[in-house]
């Protein structure tokens, strides 16, 4: 398990995730955001009609962690470690080497 930084246009937070996810964070996050939330078995959880016939999805880092825990890596439970008290573009120097993704 490795630490990564995830955000969704809000406070950046450190999560611990499986090594495979941390080492390929962009791929896992992109697959979740571009495929899973639209076509996965829980798509109705994310899909919202904003106006007649105009649909979109709403999700964030906690939803990605739920996906990892329930569907992708149930044998390795990911979890929140701590919030950094800043946005993804203000990461403190000591954490800049962490893999990061902003949804």
Where do the PLM segments sit?
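Short, extreme N-terminal segment that most often corresponds to the first beta-strand
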Residues: 1-22
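Short, mixed-charge low-complexity intrinsically disordered segments
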Residues: 33-103
